């Protein structure tokens, strides 16, 4: 195929939409002197970054399908994970169920961590014919209950000596404030503290492995709390808003992923956001948003693709600690407000905040 010649792109200096202009400008001015393959890759990158800057098309099924087409993505089923053990939390519906289905065809040995035994049994029965590895193993746990997480980790440690991938997917957006058995706001408990404890306990089994955390594009709206002013990850009851609390927890997940990568170089850590996917969680928690965006929402399978890909791809095509969407590294901030909050002091306070929760629990055992 003969590629068209590209003339240098002249970008207006006015800041009509700075992010969009920067994304479009990318490296097009250099295409004149590059080879065909470089031209293809550069144009693909430009399109992807433009979609990302525009948000709505980038997060929707439009962005997914355009990127899949221009990237000529390898099917998840083409990866060979025979002999690899993958732990997935929250596998009974939505993204988690689709990740389990996609990875079943790779030959991976799946460990499904779920709170509902009956729902997990249904998933296991349905994906068993797809499995080319061992039949999936069920481990019961409520990720917002630290005692339940500890028991699940003990069960995993008793059955396995090594884990290749741990996928933190479990969680939900709660519209009313709920408290975990350990007295922690439930969104923070299930999305942040529970996964932090599980990672800590399973880390000896994850040497040479990878931890994948499923965040959300909603985290772009949230800065880190101002811990010096007495704020924590938990919103007080008189100011509680489910979507805002969810975004705070999702921001914490991404920041902690970067910090885990610095703390534990023997294990790879990545986080990602799936875009806007039509899952039971979206249908139940934010029905108004779904009604408006229904025509452009991704399927749960499309939203799950990058999760499964990050579990399967070797070597990791990026640094440990990186943040992904649609098989590409993405920025962790889109606004000066959230970037300004991301300081060394705030990060140290975040780590201490979560460590204190976990230490308080482990000392009480």
List the predicted regions and their residue ranges.
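Generic detector of N-terminal low-structure segments
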Residues: 8, 18-21
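C-terminal amphipathic/interface module of NAD(P)-dependent oxidoreductases
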Residues: 35-40, 340-365
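Short glycine/proline- and charge-enriched loop/turn segments
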Residues: 229-238, 285-292, 331-334
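Rossmann-fold NAD(P)H-dependent dehydrogenase/reductase core
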Residues: 40-282, 359-365
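N-terminal polybasic/positive-inside topogenic patches
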Residues: 9-13, 27
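C-terminal helical subdomain
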Residues: 45-49, 294-335, 345-352, 360
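Extreme N-terminal basic, low-complexity initiation segments
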Residues: 1-9
